[in-house]
Amino acid sequence: MHGNGGQPAAGGSESALSREGQPGPSGAAQGQVISNERSPRRYSTRTINGVQATNKFTAVGNPSLQRDPDWYRWNYNHSIAVWLRECSRSHAKICNCGQFRKHWFQECAGLEDRSTQASLEEAILRPLRVQGKRAKRKLDYHYSQPTPNRKKVYKTVRWQDELADREADFTPSEEDGGTTSSDFDEDINFDIGGDSGIVDELLGRPFTTPAPVRIV
């Protein structure tokens, strides 16, 4: 601190703050001197204990890792999440204990072999098949959309064609007596007539003696 008239304080020497600058993020720390020279590429040079150093290779864009810790924390958490996901997928292919975290402890570090299970191949190939079907649906949608040189492609109803093919290929067997269902439909008359008691009961009319159903 300076005394009256701008003279140095008692002791004949300047304080540490006036000699090295304000402490903190904007100034130098103990034993550091910051040069005022700024590079066109936005990195600075420091002299630490007589050794010249620069943050040219440590800066990440304008806000470096030292000035913006949230950037480092976000990337760290993202990397950990990706690693845990890969551990879970790899563990599911070789063990069926349920949780891969159990193998981090010595008392339950053994592996349970899945090679004897019949569903091993299905468990490994199912993600690939599901992703393939999902990708095919997306491609089918884009293929059906109209383009300047092509009209919209509509889906083809295949179940009607398959039903017609089955009826055309049907041949009566010997157990059926060589007859089809159409032969029986011609001999049955389902007309119950207007004077039937069933019709009166459905309409809420007084119940009368129902007429017999005629079967020709």
From Swiss-Prot:
Compositionally biased intervals (Low complexity): 21-32
Record's compositionally biased regions (Acidic residues): 172-187
GO MF terms held by the record: protein serine/threonine phosphatase activity; protein tyrosine phosphatase activity
Substrates-to-products reaction catalysed: O-phospho-L-tyrosyl-[protein] + H2O = L-tyrosyl-[protein] + phosphate; O-phospho-L-seryl-[protein] + H2O = L-seryl-[protein] + phosphate; O-phospho-L-threonyl-[protein] + H2O = L-threonyl-[protein] + phosphate
Xref: InterPro entries: HEV_TT_vir_Orf2/Gyrovir_Vp2_N
Keywords assigned by UniProt, alphabetized: Early protein, Hydrolase, Protein phosphatase
EC primary class: hydrolase
Induction notes from the record: VP1 and VP2 are detected 12 hours post infection, while VP3 only after 24 hours.
Catalytic residues (positions): C95
Region (Disordered) residue spans: 1-50, 165-187
Known EC number: 3.1.3.16, 3.1.3.48
Family designation: Belongs to the gyrovirus protein VP2 family.
Biological role: May act as a scaffold protein in virion assembly. May also play a role in intracellular signaling during viral replication.
Protein name: Dual specificity protein phosphatase VP2
UniProt source species: Chicken anemia virus (isolate Germany Cuxhaven-1) (CAV)
Gene coding for it: VP2
